[in-house]
């Protein structure tokens, strides 16, 4: 009696570098038994994540037709983003009101939120759906975030969903020099992640440092006047 054996992977497995992109190839063998054994083989190639610097990213957009997808939260996106990009955040504001979330949000807002201006977020459950609604699986996507971590995580999810032409900017937008991309917003792309008390502290430190340097120079060059202004304590 004829029988069908479902496809299973063989021992053939290799990786290769092609055009700066790592490739995996897996050979699948399907066996159809009907008197004589007939073997069919097909090759499935999956492109892995490609990391590029800012200049290479600019070339991907201009020369290879990559679309920019900004996966940052709304706050950083509004401060500065690449012109004509799509905004599909990997994380969204967490406004849940269960007791556990309220406690976590309060702790976050009094530490990370206060000092670094980081919003309290959760994974966007509509991320994949939003990408699918805007881009087909054969689209070329350049994912960007502020540090490079969220874009890498987003790329991993998209690869699992069948997207193969994906690139990310190494170290994110914080590594982009002013003028590299045409941007929209109140600040430069590399500064969009800076917020909270740490930005004020930086300005205070600069002013305080200037005052101390001036005081030191005054004491060195005008010791008599300095002694009158700051008499030594007995």
From Swiss-Prot:
Transit peptide region: 1-47
InterPro entries in alphabetical order: Rhodanese-like_dom, Rhodanese-like_dom_sf, STR9
Protein name, UniProt field: Rhodanese-like domain-containing protein 9, chloroplastic
Subcellular location(s) of the protein: Plastid, Chloroplast; Membrane
Domain of life: Eukaryota
Keywords: Chloroplast, Membrane, Plastid, Transit peptide, Transmembrane, Transmembrane helix
Gene: STR9
Domain Rhodanese: 62-185
Topological type in the membrane: Single-pass membrane protein
Active site: 145 (cysteine persulfide intermediate)
This protein's GO CC annotations: chloroplast; chloroplast thylakoid; chloroplast thylakoid membrane; cytosol
Regions that span the bilayer: 204-222
Keyword Plastid: yes
């Amino acid at each position: 009696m004829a029988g069908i054996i479902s496809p299973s992977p063989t021992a053939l497995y290799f990786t290769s570098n092609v055009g700066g992109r790592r490739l995996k190839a897996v050979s699948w063998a399907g066996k159809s038994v009907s008197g004589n054994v007939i073997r069919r083989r097909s090759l499935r190639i999956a492109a892995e994540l490609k990391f590029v610097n800012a200049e290479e990213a600019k070339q991907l957009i201009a020369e290879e037709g990559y679309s920019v997808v900004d996966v940052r939260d709304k706050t950083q996106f509004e401060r500065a983003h690449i012109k004509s990009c799509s905004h599909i955040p990997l994380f969204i504001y967490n406004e849940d009101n269960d007791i556990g979330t309220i406690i976590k949000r309060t702790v976050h807002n009094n530490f990370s939120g206060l000092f670094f201006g980081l919003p309290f977020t959760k994974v966007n459950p509509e991320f994949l759906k939003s990408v699918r609604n805007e881009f087909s699986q054969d689209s070329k996507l350049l994912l960007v975030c502020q540090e490079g971590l969220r874009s890498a995580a987003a790329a991993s999810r998209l690869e699992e969903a069948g997207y193969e032409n994906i690139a990310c900017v190494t170290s994110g937008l914080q590594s982009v020099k002013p003028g590299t991309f045409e941007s929209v917003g109140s600040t430069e792309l590399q500064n969009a992640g800076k917020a909270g008390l740490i930005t004020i502290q930086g300005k205070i430190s600069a002013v305080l440092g200037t005052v101390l340097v001036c005081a030191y120079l005054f004491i060195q060059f005008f010791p008599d006047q300095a002694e009158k202004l700051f008499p030594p304590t007995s």
